[in-house]
């Protein structure tokens, strides 16, 4: 099967793209998301970034932990469980995550 010349390949979704989009959405710096700050807004943005990385890229928990200041995989598991619980109860969070995923895949 041949491609038409004007068809474009989807841009690969990178960690930087996901963290950048989460950063813009939550008004937090990418360095803070990947860093060790623990204030509520940064922690929320970090959980969203971790969740999206796992869902979109399929990275292992160990790989994700290394990208976020060397966090242990158990910390990543906790973040994912927290996000799953929060998304069940929070329509706005589900919409925010969905919008970020659409933007990083665009």
Regions found by a protein language model. Give the residues of each.
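Residue-level marker of regulatory loop/turn positions in helix-turn-helix DNA-binding domains and
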Residues: 7, 11, 42-43
């Amino acid at each position: 099967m041949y491609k038409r010349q004007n068809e474009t390949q989807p841009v690969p979704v990178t960690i930087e793209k996901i963290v950048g989009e989460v950063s813009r959405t939550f008004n937090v710096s990418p360095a803070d998301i990947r860093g060790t700050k623990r204030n509520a807004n940064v922690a929320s943005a970090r959980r969203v970034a971790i969740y999206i990385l796992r869902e979109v890229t399929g990275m292992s928990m160990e790989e994700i932990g290394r990208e976020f200041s060397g966090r242990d995989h158990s910390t990543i598991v906790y973040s994912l469980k927290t996000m799953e619980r929060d998304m069940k109860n929070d329509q706005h969070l589900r919409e925010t995550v969905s919008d970020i995923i659409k933007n990083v895949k665009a």
